[in-house]
Structures are given as structure tokens and as C-alpha cells.
Amino acid sequence: MARLFVVVALLALAVGTVFAADAPSAAPTASPTKSPTKAPAAAPKSSAAAPKASSPVAEEPTPEDDYSAASPSDSAEAPTVSSPPAPTPEADGPSSDGPSSDGPAAAESPKSGATTNVKLSIAGTVAAAGFFIFSL
């Protein structure tokens, strides 16, 4: 009974490792073809432009502090989140002697299901070897 438990545990571990290796990483990876996207730096505030505490301007609520809108979707001036613009092929410049831009580059080629099938075959082989070893 203990052998069966060990074999099933090895099989589960092998299959789990295969699928964990195919899962995307939680950490973002830097793409060598794209420029890094950083948030724009805020302009430094000068002390002359900042209102003083005794100034009547400082006591009035600013438009950012106005919470009269029920929700951001009700306000027409609500900030929206947008993705950075997609890179255009013209931005890199046309390359007459390079590979054509019709298909993905070698570094950008999508993974096929064949990789997963090979890994599952290896996991099955490990499981079969485990069954054989622990059945002796």
C-alpha cells in the first residue's frame, strides 16, 4: 500500500511539474524588442507656486478633492487608464536585407503544443519507471 502511495505521489509530482513549467511566470519579464514602459515623472513643485497655509486658495477644495461625483464612471472628467500605443513597423525603419515582417521573429515565435506533449511523454515515462521500480 505504501508503494502505491509513493508511485501515485511521483506521478502527481511529475505531471504537476510539467504543467508548472508551462505556466506563465507571475513576475513580468522584460522584452528585448520593446522599450521599457515607465510612468512619466511628476514635475518638481516649486516652493513659489505652492499656496501657503494662510492663503485663502489653500482652504478651497481643489477639483481633485471634489468628491461630489457618485462614482468615477458618473464623472465625465474621470481619469481613464489606457495601454501604451502599439509599436508600429515603421518606427523601427524598413529593413531591406533583414527578415520580412510578415511573420513573428524567432524570439517571438509562439510555443506549440508539441512542447507540452513531449514533457507529458517524459512525465509518463518517469511514472512508468516508478511503477516498475516499486513493483519489484
Swiss-Prot record:
UniProt keywords (A-Z) are: Cell membrane, Glycoprotein, GPI-anchor, Lipoprotein, Membrane, Proteoglycan, Signal
Q: Which residues form the propeptide?
A: 113-136
What the record says about the induction of its expression is: Up-regulated by AHL16/TEK.
TM ranges are: none
GO BP terms: pollen tube growth
Point to the regions of Low complexity compositional bias.
24-56, 68-81, 89-107
Please list where the region (Disordered) is annotated: 24-115
Q: Does the keyword Signal apply?
A: yes
Q: Where does lipidation (GPI-anchor amidated serine) occur on this chain?
A: 112
Principal subcellular localisation of the protein: membrane
Q: Which residues form the signal peptide?
A: 1-20
Q: Name one GO cellular component term.
A: side of membrane
The record describes its membrane topology as: Lipid-anchor; GPI-anchor
Q: Where in the cell is it found?
A: Cell membrane
Q: What does the UniProt record tell us about how this protein is modified after translation?
A: O-glycosylated on the hydroxyproline residues.
InterPro entries in UniProt: AGP
Q: What does this protein do?
A: Proteoglycan that seems to be implicated in diverse developmental roles such as differentiation, cell-cell recognition, embryogenesis and programmed cell death.
The entry sums up its family as follows: Belongs to the classical AGP family.
Protein name (database record): Classical arabinogalactan protein 11
Q: Which organism is it from?
A: Arabidopsis thaliana
